Amino acid sequence: EIEENAELDLFESFNAHAGDERISAVVADMEAELGKGNKMAGILPRLAQYELTLLDWAEAHKGSRKYVVFANKCWPAFQTQFGFVPCYVNSRLTKIGIPVACEVDIYGAVSEYIGVCVSQKPVTLLDINNTVPADIYNDDIAGKFPYTHKDTFMGFHCGNTASCLVKEPQMKFQRIMKRNLEPDSEPNISRGTLEGDIVDGNITFFRFQSTADAQLKGYIAEGEVLPVATRSFGSIGIFAINEMGRFYRHVLVQKNYPHHGAVAFGHYGKALHSVMTYLGITDIGFNQPKGMLYPTENPFAD
């Protein structure tokens, strides 16, 4: 069941939580979670107010349903009106089994929820369309890991990944929004990201998606996060998936998938494939090994 509400409705509810007596307890919990990474303590009360807003909203609106996910708008008007970026709160709710997808990504939220059910662990939602700089690949990956440059990519989002999945998590600000919205001042309304390199280890990148004619499709690709520093910002990691370049071209791009992918931390391809099959999905893309051509792949290409 989907309930659609305006950002204005959320803003009204947020304002109604001003002065909520529970805010101090949530701030204390945030402080304990962040530890030495609590670099912008002044924004925590507003973030706590927003977290309570979402939790109360879920309880008040779930009706007979047992589980809830959110697909929320998070920019550009959000910062100027709410006074922060919501990434850290999104990460905290996802950590406790209430996925909050960025940028109103409904199928991203559904994908995250299924990932939680399959893995029984927190998941995340990342952009899948950023390359690894050549110098990082040449210096830290080539000859050390069994991947070509095209097998690797940067999985990135502003700061929405749970603290348990990030190395040395720190409360920071969204740099792009800072440049656009408050270029000449100290970070204020751009504060609220949870930043750090994502923990290395096995992962499964996947997504459930609908087509314009209401047909479900999906993709699954197992891989890993490499133990290589990203030298960047946000919740970010260097991912490696065998034959990623071909998979990106012939599945993600050719089949019009959005740039968000859900990430489960472990290899769960078998279970996710079964879930997709149970849901009647027949178009299930995966990273086909070298020599196993995609239907439109040129057999004469290098």
Positions of PLM-derived features:
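Conserved, well-structured core segments that form the ligand-binding/active-site neighborhood
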Residues: 1-129
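C-terminal catalytic subdomain
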Residues: 94-231
